[in-house]
């Protein structure tokens, strides 16, 4: 169990190193207003913290830096919530204030804004479309031969595609089809739509649509949509601006992993509910052993729909990042309920 004095010194070392990226020595600590101990006492306490594994010496300096154990203790026991600036809160809330909530568009913009606000790499795993339920479908004619099919799900996903309208299918047929589809399919999971259409809906359509065969072929193409999650990145190259990653050999494997977007699917897909912080070698990939990954899930009720994560150095602004993720996931969850 650390003493109050050791807790204060450890917290000050971590806070200072996060801000400066420079090893922290006893002289630096002695100049801090909150540190009222003598330099000799500070050195003794730092020696004890080093022996306990919370801080470590670097090769190039007499100062100390937090170890992974030190960061973990800091995150678990010493972290204080950080109030975000009003202009950032307004910027984030404005993103989610759109009357029509398009989850994929918001996910993409969220990744970009988070990367700009943190100067780290932001990753957003969008909702898995197969678990979405159909809210409504629209078919909007552009001319006699083409139309735009718009599929909207309960999570705000909007999928649109241009389809060819067979000559034998007239506008009244289109209108009847849309009415039947919305009446019979609203609330059905996207993964079940194709099967339901061709086992049940076709029978209903046969009684209302004149050119039944042509209409069914058009429907088949309309509902062929990708069902897996989409992943969005913001600030892929931001890690290069961090002092600890100026060594290209050190950062190469990390950048390769970031470029291989599929690698993050497994990392983010099965995250536990709430805020999760993985520090250094707690991460499953060796390419991330000098990084911290903070992730948060967003959901509707008890149904977890996606994940928002920030990848940065272990010398990360943990409190600020957690506050940002809490605000984003809260806004995302509220938006999905619209």
UniProtKB/Swiss-Prot annotation:
Classification via InterPro entries: GAF-like_dom_sf, HrcA, HrcA_C, WH-like_DNA-bd_sf, WH_DNA-bd_sf, WHTH_transcript_rep_HrcA_IDD
Keyword field contains Transcription: yes
Gene Ontology MF annotations: DNA binding
One GO term of the biological process aspect: negative regulation of DNA-templated transcription
Pfam family, one: HrcA
Keywords, in A-Z order: Repressor, Stress response, Transcription, Transcription regulation
Family named by the database record: Belongs to the HrcA family.
Role according to the record: Negative regulator of class I heat shock genes (grpE-dnaK-dnaJ and groELS operons). Prevents heat-shock induction of these operons.
Protein name per the record: Heat-inducible transcription repressor HrcA
Source organism (scientific name): Bacillus mycoides (strain KBAB4) (Bacillus weihenstephanensis)
């Amino acid at each position: 169990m650390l003493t109050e004095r050791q807790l204060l010194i450890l917290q000050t070392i971590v806070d200072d190193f996060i801000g400066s990226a420079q090893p922290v020595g006893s002289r630096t600590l002695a100049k801090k207003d909150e540190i009222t101990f003598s330099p000799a006492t500070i050195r003794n306490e730092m020696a004890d913290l080093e022996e306990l594994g919370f801080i470590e010496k670097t090769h190039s300096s007499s100062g100390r830096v937090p170890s992974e154990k030190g960061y973990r203790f800091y995150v678990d026991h010493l972290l204080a919530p950080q109030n975000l600036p009003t202009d950032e809160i307004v910027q984030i809330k404005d993103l989610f204030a759109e009357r029509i909530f398009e989850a994929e568009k918001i996910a993409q913009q969220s990744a970009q804004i988070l990367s700009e606000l943190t100067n780290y790499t932001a990753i957003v795993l969008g909702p898995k479309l197969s678990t979405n339920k159909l809210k409504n479908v629209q078919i909007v004619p552009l001319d006699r031969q083409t139309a735009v099919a718009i599929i909207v799900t309960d999570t705000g996903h909007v999928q649109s595609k241009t389809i060819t309208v067979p000559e034998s299918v007239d506008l009244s047929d289109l209108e009847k089809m849309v009415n039947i589809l919305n009446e019979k399919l609203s609330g059905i999971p996207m993964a079940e739509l194709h099967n339901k259409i061709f086992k049940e809906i076709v029978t209903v359509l046969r009684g209302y649509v004149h050119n039944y065969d042509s209409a069914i072929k058009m429907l088949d193409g309309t509902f062929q949509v990708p069902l897996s999650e989409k992943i969005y990145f913001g600030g892929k190259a931001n890690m290069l601006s961090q002092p600890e990653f100026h060594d290209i050999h050190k950062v190469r494997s990390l950048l390769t992993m970031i470029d291989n977007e599929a690698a993050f699917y497994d990392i983010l897909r099965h995250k536990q509910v709430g805020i999760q912080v993985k520090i250094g070698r707690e991460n499953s990939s060796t390419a991330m052993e000098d990084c911290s990954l903070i992730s948060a899930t967003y959901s509707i009720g008890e149904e977890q729909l996606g994940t928002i994560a920030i990848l940065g150095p272990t010398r990360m602004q943990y409190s600020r990042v957690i506050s940002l993720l809490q605000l984003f996931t809260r806004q995302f969850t509220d938006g999905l309920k619209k």
